[in-house]
């Protein structure tokens, strides 16, 4: 069985039956940022920018480019992080931070790239495969197709340029 927790921009979270939440004590989430541990933050950010149509955040005040900003940092801090964001401000910001270790196990969290929403059967699989073909030259790796079952439509499991799993859904 595979179940995904999906954040849909038009419907909010979908997980099980609703429970009572006291709105007086509930925190109000203003934004969501997804953070990736990686060895090359800029390369992973460039990959996800191409996948999602995201852009770099605004250049910090006082600098004419991100490269100029990076050059102003201490040597040990250069290249330690990068980010990208939805140009429309709707999707979550993605943040990439350098860590010394490489990925060794399956992700506990992954992104679903919703390219087949509303499609079923062969039409859905064709859309997933077409997107996988587009992402291959960017450094993505196709792992396997999870066929449709009684609970879920088909999805395609992929890896980004550093081996982080994601699904074409």
Task: Label every PLM stretch briefly.
Residues 1, 52-53, 136-140:
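Glycine-centered loop/turn motif at secondary-structure junctions
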Residues 1-25:
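N-terminal amphipathic/basic-hydrophobic helices that include classical n-h-c signal peptides
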Residues 16, 46, 50, 54-56, ...:
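Acidic (Asp/Glu-rich) sequence patches and key acidic residues
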Residues 20-22, 27-36, 58-59, 68-73, ...:
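Vicinal oxygen chelate
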Residues 27, 39-49:
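Hydrophobic ligand-binding cavity/cleft-lining segments
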Residues 43-44, 119-127:
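Short, conserved charged micro-motifs
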Residues 77:
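Hydrophobic small-molecule pocket/channel-lining residues, especially in calycin-type beta-barrels
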């Amino acid at each position: 069985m595979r179940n995904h927790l999906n954040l849909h921009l038009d419907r909010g979270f979908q997980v099980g039956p609703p429970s009572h939440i006291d709105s007086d004590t509930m925190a109000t989430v203003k934004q969501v940022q997804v953070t990736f541990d990686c060895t090359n933050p800029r390369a992973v950010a460039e990959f996800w920018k191409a996948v999602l149509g995201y852009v770099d955040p605004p250049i910090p005040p006082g600098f004419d480019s991100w490269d100029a900003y990076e050059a102003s940092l201490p040597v040990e801090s250069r290249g330690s992080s990068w980010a990208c964001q939805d140009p429309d401000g709707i999707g979550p910001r993605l943040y990439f931070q350098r860590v010394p270790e490489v990925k060794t196990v399956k992700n506990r969290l992954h992104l679903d790239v919703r390219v087949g929403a509303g499609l079923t059967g062969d039409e859905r699989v064709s859309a997933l495969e077409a997107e996988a073909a587009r992402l291959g030259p960017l450094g993505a790796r196709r792992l396997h197709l999870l066929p449709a079952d009684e609970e879920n439509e088909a999805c395609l499991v992929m890896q980004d340029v550093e081996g982080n799993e994601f699904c074409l859904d």
